[in-house]
Amino acid sequence: MASSGTTSTRKRFTGAEFIVHFLEQQGIKIVTGIPGGSILPVYDALSQSTQIRHILARHEQGAGFIAQGMARTDGKPAVCMACSGPGATNLVTAIADARLDSIPLICITGQVPASMIGTDAFQEVDTYGISIPITKHNYLVRHIEELPQVMSDAFRIAQSGRPGPVWIDIPKDVQTAVFEIETQPAMAEKAAAPAFSEESIRDAAAMINAAKRPVLYLGGGVINAPARVRELAEKAQLPTTMTLMALGMLPKAHPLSLGMLGMHGVRSTNYILQEADLLIVLGARFDDRAIGKTEQFCPNAKIIHVDIDRAELGKIKQPHVAIQADVDDVLAQLIPLVEAQPRAEWHQLVADLQREFPCPIPKACDPLSHYGLINAVAACVDDNAIITTDVGQHQMWTAQAYPLNRPRQWLTSGGLGTMGFGLPAAIGAALANPDRKVLCFSGDGSLMMNIQEMATASENQLDVKIILMNNEALGLVHQQQSLFYEQGVFAATYPGKINFMQIAAGFGLETCDLNNEADPQASLQEIINRPGPALIHVRIDAEEKVYPMVPPGAANTEMVGE
C-alpha cells in the first residue's frame, strides 16, 4: 500500500469506531445490513456517523445484493454488514454471486468474542472457513491492532486485478477493545495492473491484421474499457459478440454487434463464430453457457486472450497469444498497431448467415406478451435507465430483446444464476443513482425469493419499477423438463394463485396490472413516469419458451427451437 497521504496525529478508537472512521475515510456513503448482537458495537459507532447512511435490509442476502447493485453501477467497493451465525450464513449466496461475477464488495460480520471461538457459543459458526471458497480473500481479526492493515488491504484487494468480495469477520471483543494509532492508513488504492510485453502486443496485432474472419469476443472484464473496445472494433471492422455480462458494451443496434452468443444467444452468431479464423477474447472466461461443448467451439480459430486473471488464461481454451493485463492498458498499445481494414468478404458472409438464421421476436408489439412487454417498457425510458433482472426465462428474454446501449446499464446474476438477485440489486442501483430510473424484470419464482425487500424500496421511496412476468411456474425448469426429460414437468409449477398486487400494495408500492388495463402501453408509461417504487404485473403463458436454446452438453450449433 502506498504510504503517501498518511497523517501522524495520534488518535484513540475502539475497534468499532475505527471501522466506521476508516469507511468514512474511504468515501463510503451507504452501508447496508441487518444488526445483531455480535456486531452491535459497530452499529453503535455507525449511529454517530454524519457521513454514512445505513440502509436496513429485510434479509442479509438482500443486503448483500443491495451492496452488489451499488458496486455494479459505480465500479467501486460497496459494504454490507451482518451479525454472526445466521446473519453471516444468510450472506453467503450474495457473496458467492459477487465472487463469480467479479464484483468488489466488503462484507463485515460480527463474531463471538475471540476467547469463545470454537466453543459452540450462541450464534457461532466458522465464518472464516465458510467464506474461503466464495471470496477473493477473507480475514478473521483476532487482535485490534490488526484492524488498520486488514481494512486497508481489504479495500485494495477487492478492487485490484480481477475484482471480488473480501470478507472481514470481527469478534465482538475486538470491536469493543481500545487502541491508539499514530499513523492512519492512507486511502486504499487499486494495485497496479500486471505489466505485459511489447512482443505479445506485436504478435496480437499481427494476428489481427492477417486474419480474414476475425471476431471480437467480449466478457464482463471489459467493463472499464468501453471507449477503446469500440475503437478497436470499428478500426479493424471486427464483428463483435458479447457474453451475458458484457451486454451494452456495444450498442444493440451497432452495425458490428452480433449480440449475445451461447445457450440462449443469437442463432446466427453461434454459426458465425464457427466460421471465424481468429477470436480476440477480452475479459471473458469461456464459460460453458457461452461456448457450449468446448471442443466444438470455434474449431478453426486461433485465439488471442486478454484477461487480468492469470488463472483464466488457458483454463478452458488454449490461446495462441495470452496476455495477463488490464484490457484498457492492452488496447491502448494494441490499437495503434492494428490496421484499418474493410473486411468486405467477411462482412458479406456475416450478413448472409444473419439472413439465413434470422432472430425473430414473436409478439414484439404486444405489451401483454414476453418480448412485447420488454419492448414496451424500453419505449418508456431512455438509456439512462438501469436494468436489473432476476434469473430465469425473463432474464434471457430481456437479454435478447432489451436495447442495452451502455456499460453498467445491465445488472444480472451471471455466474451463479441467483434467483432473488433482481429486486435488491435494483434497490442498490437506485441508492447509488438516485437520478436514474431502475427497472427490475422478474418472474414470480424469482420475486418470491427476496420479496421482503419491497419494504426496503418503499421505506426509502426509491424509483424502482418491478416488471413481473407471472407464469405461475419456474419457467426455465419447466422448459428444460418439457424439452429434455421423459417424465415431463414436475415440481415446477405453483398450483396456488398468489395476489402479487395485494402483496406489493401491502408493502407500500404502487401497482398496475396490465392485463386489466384498456390501454396497456399508456398505463405502463404512466406508472413508470410516476416517482417511487411500483409493481407492474403481466401474466405470461407457462408454455412460452426461450429460443433458441442449446441443450445442456451440446455444441452451440445444435440449437433447438424456433
Swiss-Prot record:
Entry GO CC: acetolactate synthase complex
GO aspect biological process, one term: L-valine biosynthetic process
SUPFAM superfamilies in UniProt: DHS-like NAD/FAD-binding domain, Thiamin diphosphate-binding fold (THDP-binding)
Residues engaged in binding Mg(2+): D444, N471
UniProt region (Thiamine pyrophosphate binding), positions on chain: 393-473
TM regions (residue ranges): none
Residues annotated for thiamine diphosphate binding in this entry: E60
GO MF term list: acetolactate synthase activity; flavin adenine dinucleotide binding; magnesium ion binding; thiamine pyrophosphate binding
Catalytic reactions of this protein: 2 pyruvate + H(+) = (2S)-2-acetolactate + CO2
Gene3D superfamilies listed in its UniProt record: 3.40.50.970, TPP-binding domain
Recorded metabolic or biological pathway in which this protein acts: Amino-acid biosynthesis; L-isoleucine biosynthesis; L-isoleucine from 2-oxobutanoate: step 1/4; Amino-acid biosynthesis; L-valine biosynthesis; L-valine from pyruvate: step 1/4
Note accompanying the cofactor annotation: Binds 1 Mg(2+) ion per subunit. Binds 1 thiamine pyrophosphate per subunit.
Cofactor(s) listed in the protein's UniProt record: Mg(2+); thiamine diphosphate
Binding-site list for FAD: 162, 264-285, 307-326
NCBIfam families: acolac_lg (TIGR00118), PRK08155.1 (NF006016)
Comment field (misc): E.coli contains genes for 3 AHAS isozymes: ilvBN, ilvGM and ilvIH. Contains 1 molecule of FAD per monomer. The role of this cofactor is not clear considering that the reaction does not involve redox chemistry.
Similarity section: Belongs to the TPP enzyme family.
The name this protein goes by in its record: Acetolactate synthase isozyme 1 large subunit
